[in-house]
Amino acid sequence: MEIKKLLSGIKVGNCETCKNENCNGKLNYDSLCSNVNYLKEYGEQNYEKNRETFKELKKIMGEQKPAIFSFGCGVGFDYIGATENFGSKVIYYPIDECRWAIMDTENYKNFEPKLPKRIIKFNDGIMLLSMTPNNAVLCFFNSLFTISQNTDLKNKLLLALKSKNNFYFVCDFTVNNNFHLPTVEQDFIYDLLKALKIKFTFKKFDILDGKGIIILGNKR
């Protein structure tokens, strides 16, 4: 995927000289300049990581069809990785509280391959998750730390997952500005599985050279 096509023709400032404290060196969802500079730096590598994760998930799921819940989906690059591995008719729910400014540009709307046009709010995503009995895939790509620290994620997932026949929990551990956060995320996952183990058995698969994990939960 060529990220440069998405950014082509969009003129933005230089972070090294910009004096805007709300944007300079930070990811500000409402700022097109911030969006573009972030995607220049991280967009391609995030896409590659997501695609590799879905490749591993495909090996585990085989011919089963996933219902993907992408928590903290951003601009939805993981949707492309999902369709490349599971086909264009994959069920995909882009869940985020913030809509990126770049999503309202013609570049985004006309980008090929297609990117998500809508964003589902967190509580609505949890509701849809609770209504999906089989093969729900909960994806947290660089997002589990932030979401778990700012929402009642654990309790909401416990309620949504308790009636499932099976589910997949997919996490690429978060790394921000060389500050590693996987310990917090690993603790969250451990606590979640501990609370669910009375109803489910689990199988774990390390991915991305230990920088991520896929967990299959099957009802007892």
What are these regions (language model features)?
Residues 136-151:
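A short SAM/SAH-binding and catalytic strip from SAM-dependent methyltransferases
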Residues 1-24:
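N-terminal auxiliary segments of SAM/dcSAM-dependent transferases
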Residues 106-132:
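S-adenosyl-L-methionine
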Residues 165-176:
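Conserved beta-strand signature within the Rossmann-like core of class I S-adenosyl-L-methionine
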Residues 26-60:
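Class I SAM-dependent methyltransferase Rossmann-like catalytic core
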Residues 184-220:
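Class I S-adenosyl-L-methionine
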Residues 75-87:
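Conserved SAM-binding loop of SAM-dependent methyltransferases across substrates and taxa
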Residues 84-116:
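Class I SAM-dependent methyltransferase SAM/SAH-binding core
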